[in-house]
């Protein structure tokens, strides 16, 4: 017991005499955490605003520099660089150093490479670099500009971790690396995310700032267009770009570069560039996952055809899918489109500062001024030292006999130095230089060289003094140096900036506005084709296999419109349905198309009789005509809310069907033709405007068994084209047809015979259009109406198309090409021939 008490007393005595202090745990935690946080911020996660480098990047570059791994020297093993950096400057894991070095050698990670790598340094698919013992590296040519003049006291050096080496606190950085290559990092309580930019644009921005220090971020935006990422892709110009230029924070929307290609049997989305920091393999896996989960439909196949030439990701589209709509879904659901958050946080004088674009350029510019001043002072000191020595050498050369005598008489060097000082006022440095001078330097030629060198040094010294005294001259020199960098390393943008495109994705925002041909077969198969799919042929041409159809099917409708036009489908039952033109999948001339029932909710026994396009509902009318001659006029704006499920467009008797619908302007003359070759002409204002669901009135008087087979207006031309089923047709001036009241019998226009066959269509034209004729076999002949001579009434006409046995002319379409605005217009002038 006594022994234990002695031990307790001894412990108390030791505690009383110890240096242990009582402290607050909360205070100690706060202090330790702040030390750790600042260490991470300053020494690990954030780049210096002056050279754009974190300590580990700077150490790798400087380690390669002092190791002689320059761009014009042979490659050396990566392990050599990693080992040197780890042993001298960065006492951390070798993989951290190697990963840093590898990233600076990856063209998909850095916009401007700082390491010239030889071997496998990873891929955009997420493949890791080969082991450091296999790969080789050296500094890139551009990296040498970061280290340029580092041996001329341009930056401060500090001791390394063990005090045996010196390392730079910042690099001279002859180009704005922070903005050129960007940076990203996560510190404690803060992070940085700086996008890369185009070097040429940055230099233009710096020159603008030098010339006009008061320039605004809007003015900088005129030369620095926005980010320029290593992987290219498209950048959608949004307020986010302006925001980070002004405040240092914002969002950049990056969208993959995708082209729609036509393969042999279907369309394909071909991805050639993807957003920065997107893993291609992960992207493909995500698309496959969405297809399996049935969240995205319409993809037939996906394959990666990427090579050394670049990315090529092919996504084959199913035949019944609109490629633009599928692309829209992929942009929404995958990383084909991403947002890059910009937070331009960097170290300024050792503290983290959020910089806007102008401030980042100003910090770099201040650094360049500091580098130039320090370099100039260093050069000035060296030149002044050399000038001082040259002055002594020239004195000695001019008094060489006395100098030689003094040296010969002197007992030692110090006595010679003292004598030279006394005799010629040479200080110790000059005297030592004289003693070290070789005899050959005493020749006349060498003396002249010394005099020339002295004169050049004098001029250079004066220039250095001017530079140090004149900031304008400093800025001029910096501009010249930046221009040299631009001339040598400047390049074109990789990322294209898209203006006037919304970042909000909708189907039509991705669909190019272009003119297309819309076709529909008798059985209701729809197809969208390019307007250049048909070649002009002369009258009587046999045609090409223009529009393939299924067996027992033929073409019934064809028109040209914009991809952004509304398409209105009018059916024989008097209903109307509406979709957008781009909703019809793109196809080839020889494709069969897709059923209309896939796009509109048409009934099984319902047939589409007219297909019209509308861009503006504010002006104009729809003019309806039934098979039995009932007509009606209704304003376009009554059809603006029509959807794909359809609505009633006209009412009529049970034994009647809707024949055709055309657009009118309110002051047109209407021409209605019959199967027996009669035409009635009357003014549309004879009909009052009726509601959408109203019934009409009689427009033409028909005999029993006679039906309407033509509907057109005077605004479509001054000639009347009449075409028979056997390919016989003619042109007649509309002046030959008198203006009558509606519901008249009309005037005979085509003499119907066995040679002509029943009249297929009667329509007005100008005479300078192209005529597209579609046969029952799906062949198309395009010929100019200018080749067709004008004839009188009640004649049979001439041969327009050569038809084979059992082949008949089924549809006629007029094709207009407006040369002034390059827009293609097409007037749908006929309907499928009435079966006799």
UniProtKB/Swiss-Prot annotation:
Note: Few gyrases are as efficient as E.coli at forming negative supercoils. Not all organisms have 2 type II topoisomerases; in organisms with a single type II topoisomerase this enzyme also has to decatenate newly replicated chromosomes.
Compartment(s) of residence: Cytoplasm
UniProt entry keywords in alphabetical sequence: ATP-binding, Cytoplasm, DNA-binding, Isomerase, Nucleotide-binding, Topoisomerase
UniProt domain Topo IIA-type catalytic: residue ranges: 46-510
Entry's EC annotation: 5.6.2.2
GO molecular function: ATP binding; DNA binding; DNA negative supercoiling activity
Cellular component aspect of the GO annotation: chromosome; cytoplasm; DNA topoisomerase type II (double strand cut, ATP-hydrolyzing) complex
Protein name stated in the entry: DNA gyrase subunit A
Principal place of residence: cytoplasm
Catalytic activity: ATP-dependent breakage, passage and rejoining of double-stranded DNA
InterPro entries reported in the protein's UniProt record: GyrA, GyrA/parC_rep, Gyrase/topoIV_suA_C, Topo_IIA-like_dom_sf, Topo_IIA_A/C_ab, Topo_IIA_A_a_sf, Topo_IIA_dom_A, Type_II_DNA_Topoisomerases
PROSITE patterns in alphabetical order: TOPO_IIA (PS52040)
Active site annotation, chain numbering: 134
Gene3D superfamilies: 3.30.1360.40, DNA gyrase/topoisomerase IV, subunit A, C-terminal, Topoisomerase II, domain 5, Topoisomerase, domain 3
Keyword flag DNA-binding: yes
Task of the protein: A type II topoisomerase that negatively supercoils closed circular double-stranded (ds) DNA in an ATP-dependent manner to modulate DNA topology and maintain chromosomes in an underwound state. Negative supercoiling favors strand separation, and DNA replication, transcription, recombination and repair, all of which involve strand separation. Also able to catalyze the interconversion of other topological isomers of dsDNA rings, including catenanes and knotted rings. Type II topoisomerases break and join 2 DNA strands simultaneously in an ATP-dependent manner.
GO biological process: DNA topological change; DNA-templated DNA replication
Record flagged with keyword DNA-binding: yes
